[in-house]
UniProtKB/Swiss-Prot annotation:
Keywords: Aminopeptidase, Cytoplasm, Hydrolase, Metal-binding, Metalloprotease, Protease, Zinc. It is found in: Cytoplasm. Cleaves the N-terminal amino acid of tripeptides. GO terms for molecular function: metallopeptidase activity; tripeptide aminopeptidase activity; zinc ion binding. Its main location: cytoplasm. GO terms for biological process: peptide catabolic process; proteolysis. The lineage of its organism: Bacteria, Pseudomonadati, Pseudomonadota, Gammaproteobacteria, Vibrionales. It comes from Vibrio atlanticus (strain LGP32) (Vibrio splendidus (strain Mel32)). Zn(2+) 1 binds at H78, D140, D197. HAMAP family: Aminopeptidase_M20 (MF_00550). This is Peptidase T. It comes from the Bacteria.
Length: 410
């Protein structure tokens, strides 16, 4: 446990921001640099089957220390950080024994205030790790990596704690939706796994959005503005019309819980061609299909109003709700719940309003719910984590490993 924070503060010094514009895997060189450093650490822990492949997938195993059959379980985390904010030159602040009030984030002019982030009100007396207001922190998901490795180190140092084979997997490019693309489930060797990629203490998740990307491409005609009358068709005006046709109350900022949404995430604008990048999210397959149909209907309406072929829609499914793949294996949820309760953590079962590697892995034959890291406000400069939350995550991983072995003892 004593090295947990030290590990984390070291890991966030690696710039591992993934790059959606690069089709290589991993999409950024910093991820390989980080993976190579982690590999050395896993070798130093005397784990077996330590391997780092050319695509940046790092795997290892802690062998069973019991003399009866126990299913191999896995713990998975991702090495990249989100492209939404810089992950370079991260300068964490450690706030000991937080007593309330606003936390200034370095000299950036940014701050964490309870009025904007009410979770702070429940964290009095905790030790917080924040950013300096210029970068994200990288708790998503380097906290998960630090917690997994710290739990494995604890099990190595305490061989009286019984466990079966424990498989470890660290993936690249999760934040850009590719984390599981080249994950070798058979090589990994676990019967089921858990991503350690959740937020506040207690989170246990096995439902996530069905996800589709939707690109709306608007075609115009560019003519010199001085002679444009009756000739120019400005694709930016078409794009603006399309956005105004979308349901205004079905966006991320207007939805919560099990509500789905449309999200205009990017726009590339020009007179001759404009492209709007949307993501569609819904917890039900039927819901996401209905949302696709709504977008197609809006495209058809615009084409009828303007000129056929001015607007086109390209839909790409990204991932699906893991619930249908995890629910038949209720014991893996129950083991995680009981491990949390044993560690004085109240399980908070809630849907993931996003996706994880576990969603894709579940459809690849590796059921994979998600467990908390203790972090908050991922993907931005206001990200922070509590040291106590990280410690509780380590305890849950250790207890879950032990409880699985006990469960299968005859």
């Amino acid at each position: 446990m004593e090295k947990l924070v030290e590990r984390f503060l070291n890991y966030v010094t690696f710039d591992t921001k993934s790059d959606p514009s690069n089709q290589q895997c991993p999409s950024s060189p910093g991820q390989i640099t980080f993976a190579e450093a982690l590999k050395l650490e896993l070798v130093a822990l005397d784990l077996v089957d330590v391997s780092l492949d050319d695509n940046g997938y790092l795997m290892a195993k802690l062998p069973s220390n019991v003399d009866y059959p126990v299913p191999a379980i896995g713990f998975v985390a991702h090495m990249d950080t989100a492209p939404d904010a810089s992950g370079a030159n991260v300068k964490p602040q450690v706030i000991k024994d937080y007593r309330g009030g606003t936390i200034e984030l370095g000299e950036s002019g940014e701050s964490l205030s309870p009025s904007q982030y009410p979770d702070l009100d429940s964290l009095h007396g905790h030790d917080l790790i924040t950013t300096d207001g210029t970068t994200l922190l990288g708790a998503d998901n380097k906290a998960g990596i630090a917690e997994i490795i710290s739990a494995i180190a604890y099990l190595k140092a305490n061989p009286d704690i019984k466990h079966g084979d424990i498989c470890i997997g660290f993936t690249p490019d999760e934040e850009i939706g590719r984390g599981a693309n080249l994950f070798d489930v058979e090589k990994f060797g676990a019967e089921w796994a858990y991503t350690i990629d959740g937020g506040p203490v207690g989170e246990l998740e096995f439902e996530n959005f069905n996800a589709t990307s939707a690109d709306v491409i608007c075609h115009g005609v560019n003519v010199h503005p001085g002679t444009a009358k009756g000739k120019m068709v400005n694709s930016m005006n078409i794009a603006a019309q399309f956005q105004l046709m979308m349901p205004a109350q079905e966006t991320p900022e207007c939805t919560e819980g099990y509500e789905g949404f449309y999200h205009l995430k990017s726009a590339e604008m020009g007179v001759a061609r404009s492209e709007l990048g949307y993501i569609i999210r819904d917890f039900e397959r039927e819901g996401v299909e209905a949302r696709k149909a709504v977008m197609q209907q809006k495209v058809d309406e615009l084409n009828e109003r303007l000129e056929k072929g001015r607007v086109e829609l390209v839909l790409t499914d990204s991932y699906f709700n893991m619930k249908e793949m995890v629910e038949p294996h209720q014991h893996i949820i129950e083991l995680a719940k009981q491990a949390m309760i044993e560690c004085d953590v109240e399980p908070m079962i809630k849907p993931i309003r996003g996706g994880t590697d576990g969603a894709r892995l579940s459809f690849m034959g590796l059921p994979c719910p998600n467990i908390f890291t203790g972090g908050y406000n991922f993907h931005g400069i206001h990200e922070f984590i509590t040291i106590q939350g990280m410690e509780q995550a380590v305890k849950v991983i250790v207890e879950l490993s032990q409880r699985t072995a006990t469960h299968y003892q005859k």
